[in-house]
Amino acid sequence: MNADTTQEPVATRAAWQDDAGRDLVRSFGDRMALFVRGEGAYVWDGDDKKYLDFLAGIAVNALGHAHPVFVEAITAQAATLAHVSNYFATPPQLAMAARLKRLAGTGESGRVYFGNSGAEANEAALKLARLHGRGTDRTRILTLKGGFHGRTMGALALTGKPALQADFLPMVPGVEHIDATVEALEAAMDERVAALMVEPIQGEAGVVELPEGYLAAAREITARHGALLIVDEVQTGAGRTGAWFGFQHAGIVPDAITVAKGIGGGFPIGALVTFGAASELFFPGTHGSTFGGNALGTAVGGAVLAEIESAGLVANAALRETQLREGIAALGSPLIGGVRGKGLLLGIALTSPVAKAVVAAAQEHGLIVNAANDDTIRIAPPLTIGDAEVAEFLRLFGAALATVSDALILEGAPA
């Protein structure tokens, strides 16, 4: 390799892996590929191999890669005004806030706080809960076991995964993780609870939906006890589940939601959206962000949301869910145990703990998917996919399953 390490890594597998191992923080482990460009639902690696991307940056690239609307929004706004700080307002910021309020159904009383990620949005939600309890005994915050709300310290405390917290103790105090049952919520709830925070679908737990009726019950219970109901829509928002936001499937009105990922279509942006009286909890000086709500990010986010709406991509997510469920079942693989999730956030349950092997086989066949856990494959493709991409996914995924099944048979294990 060139001795000048400031040069761009060359696109050979060994070279880029050496560069990544030397220059990038190790918290992500080994990178699985070096991608150099994308278009639509496809990406290409440094050797010009083409892949069907059914992960979309983990539910981020709602419009796929290099969508003209995304590119035009970045180009036009970068040439106009990128950032001025939150001492000032900009037209894209105001427009995106109004759009989020309308899509979430907050009414006039809703407000929007912009950050740069889902973790930042959830940190803002944690502060919202603290402000709700300010000056009272409401110091308890409830979240669900198995939930994931981010890796910054406040968001990590909200996350119901002890293994992720173990190296960073002590956690922010006052957060308790409970089972995702109405009975557990009733038992835990009292007048000292400031908020309950839940995900409509726990993506990082293996695409696990809340029990039927849970959100409606949670809304009634929290309201009865004067606690906030905060819904983490970072992975489920922006049309991914076949509704604009996951809570809308339950027909409830929360006190706040957090959003990120798909609302930027690949540009880093997050937001806390508040409803009703919760909108009055923040006051000047209680929270802030240098880059949150910058003109460039909100121009892109506003354009992405507008395209999702005008192109009918929320309905498309629901349509493609039906096709994918039927197609996955029709594969007839003994490795498939079922499908969980909604819209285009689906978890394919496996009958053996071979998810990582399936992911590797899929990549060899030119398909990008994700192992949510040892026995679940997560798919979260662009909302723009059509019949052709669904058919190609089923072909490639079927081939990957066959590869793993054959390997299991050779090893003498049940396939």
Regions inferred by a protein language model and the residue ranges of each:
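Conserved N-terminal phosphate-binding loop of PLP-dependent enzymes in the Aspartate aminotransferase
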Residues: 2-415
